[in-house]
Amino acid sequence: MEASVGQAGKTKFQIDLRRYLREDGEDEGLIHLICEIAEASKYIVNSIRTGDLGVAGTSNLYGEEQLALDVLSDRILRKRLAKSGVVSNIVSEETNDIVFVAPHRTGNYSVSYDPLDGSSLVDVNLAVGTIVSIYKGSDLMQPGNKQAAALYILYGPRTTLVYTTGNGVHEFGMNQLMEYTLLRRNIRMESKASIYAPGGLRSLYTDGTDKFVRQLETNGVKLRYSGGLVPDINQMLMKGKGIFFYPHLQNAPQGKLRLLFELNPMAFLMEQAGGAASNGHQRILDLVPQQFDERSPFFCGCREDVELAETLIREEKQIR
């Protein structure tokens, strides 16, 4: 499933994030950008531990009330990206507008991100995370298969950073000095799931998705769900044998999750680990976004289970 480096958190030789990226032959600009995001996460995790859990009094572009931690995390990450010297454009799930940093400068990257996914879980002390998608150049409206890198940072009992640049999926952990060191390299998914994490109200599932859940249960696949996208996807990757899905619903045919901010980066990570990600009809990474707030159904995990979901949803459409 994976190649670990000693025991997690007990590596014989501590390999830090920047060194690992350099040894992997990554572009210096991309290395700098990923490391800047890692630096920003140190301030975000400190804000989670000590910050204001009250409501900020504003709404994001989806009409969702913003928590103070959402606003603070967005500000931390945005400032770090804008001053990195390697970013052309920025768009956050929490704002209405794209931020043009240096759109005409060549060799730069553009970044879409969710600064604190699952922030409503903080006050009950559940894990939350930051999700980041990176593209070359200034165009953010590209299919996910054009991503230069994707990563998430999970703020749980431990703080971990999981990334891909198209050369496998690797996990780093924040140590006592708040530096990221290698825990696992080349994380791999198995072909079939033993756990599943569903989103949305099951009574609103369409027939195909409901059949899919019943088939999982018949196969002995166990329910393991935290209510947060980042910890649930992380569980699937680290266990290597699971599936997460937030499907189309009877009252929400496009589901809930956002293509640019959540689905593309998670799909890139999952595929790089040998899994699959689909909207029930086609590969997530082939979808061309038409707007920043575009949503899509999402089935992400072990390849055979994603294919089963596609088959049952296809049959549902044929019956109609």
Swiss-Prot record:
Positions with a binding annotation for Mg(2+) 1: 93, 114, 116
Protein transport listed as a keyword: no
Record text on cofactor binding: Binds 2 magnesium ions per subunit.
Record-listed E.C. numbers: 3.1.3.11
Record GO terms (molecular function): fructose 1,6-bisphosphate 1-phosphatase activity; magnesium ion binding
GO CC, alphabetical: cytosol
Keywords recorded for this protein, A-Z: Carbohydrate metabolism, Cytoplasm, Hydrolase, Magnesium, Metal-binding
SUPFAM superfamilies per record: Carbohydrate phosphatase (SSF56655)
CDD domains: FBPase
Coiled-coil stretches: none
Entry's family note: Belongs to the FBPase class 1 family.
NCBIfam families named in the record: PRK09293.2-4
Quaternary structure note: Homotetramer.
Official protein name in the record: Fructose-1,6-bisphosphatase class 1
Organism: Syntrophotalea carbinolica (strain DSM 2380 / NBRC 103641 / GraBd1) (Pelobacter carbinolicus)
Gene (name only): fbp
